[in-house]
Amino acid sequence: IKRNNFNVQIGMYKTLVSAEEDMPNILLLNIDLLVDIDNGSIQIRKNKEQKYSIFVNKITYALAENLCVRTKSQETSCSILAN
């Protein structure tokens, strides 16, 4: 799989626990898109707004776009970030 330098930031959570609780739902919603992604590329960390987000790192732009379209359809924020 060809990997590019794009990251996706999903959601804005006030606490680490709330991000951890929502993470399985986000991953299951996108399981078909994430099947070839290394688990180490998916993590929860603080974003620039000092809230917690789920990040999917080092993916192609096409995959990032698909993830965000699906995630936004579930009324969850999603941003594509160039690495």
Task: Please report, for each region that a protein language model flagged, where it lies by residue.
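Extracytoplasmic
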Residues: 1-4, 14-83
